[in-house]
Regions:
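Flexible, glycine/charged-enriched surface loops at secondary-structure junctions
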Residues: 2, 22-24, 85-88, 163-165
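Charged, alpha-helix-enriched surfaces in structured cytosolic catalytic cores
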Residues: 3-10, 19-24, 54, 68-72, ...
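Translation machinery proteins
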Residues: 4-61
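Signal for well-folded cores of large energy- and translation-related assemblies
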Residues: 12, 16, 30-33, 74-78, ...
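Flexible glycine-/small-residue-rich
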Residues: 29, 49-51, 59-63, 100-102, ...
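Active-site phosphate-binding and catalytic loops of NTP-dependent enzymes
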Residues: 33-42, 81-87, 120
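RNA pseudouridine synthases
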Residues: 45-96
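Positively charged, low-complexity, intrinsically disordered RNA-binding extensions
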Residues: 99-179
């Protein structure tokens, strides 16, 4: 039930934006839930590790075969180091991320974030996300994972065009990188 599962609701919203037919979405939900004709047990696996220069990385994967997927993910960490569960999750906040824009370039983004139920916001420009038109007020709203759907609904009802909504990891501290 997407109303009870924020991750599923986000995936369904993303599929609808990409014009995926309703029957395909419903079939994928049944397949992932292990019901219907095509039973498939999908497993959620989180890989944690460090890229070169000690940059923390978290990779979330849904797979029907962990034994096949794990070596493929290890290849991504070949110049870094694949860690164990919990090795770097403390470096990140697991949050909901909603990116949107409003035609009024002078709209109060902070007030919109508060009203929508987001914890924080960051201004976004066309250079940062090409889905945001030039001259529009763009913002990335950061909220609790369970509040993504409510934030999207409020923004859409108040004149914002939602570009993306997803669950993700935001670093608590950004590392300094050099060439």
């Amino acid at each position: 039930d997407p109303a009870m599962n924020a991750r599923l609701a986000t995936a369904v919203d993303k599929a609808k934006k990409d014009s995926v037919p309703r029957d395909v979405i419903e079939r994928a939900i049944k397949k992932g839930a292990g019901t219907g004709d095509e039973k498939l047990i999908m497993e959620h696996v989180v890989f944690e590790g460090y890229a070169p220069h000690k940059v923390g990385v978290i990779v979330e994967v849904y797979t029907d075969n962990v034994n096949r997927t794990a070596p493929e993910v290890r290849v991504l960490f070949k110049k870094g180091q694949l860690g164990t569960a919990g090795s770097n999750k403390f470096l990140f906040d697991h949050v909901g991320l909603v990116e949107a824009h409003h035609a009024d370039a002078n709209i109060d983004r902070e007030a919109a974030a508060i009203e929508a139920g987001a914890n924080e916001f960051e201004p976004l420009t066309h250079e940062q996300n090409d889905d945001i038109p030039e001259g529009a007020a763009g913002a990335r709203f950061i909220c609790d994972r369970t509040a993504v759907h409510a934030v999207v609904k409020w923004l859409a009802a108040n004149g914002w065009n939602v570009v993306t909504s997803e669950l993700g990891y935001v670093p608590k501290q950004f590392p300094e990188l050099t060439d």
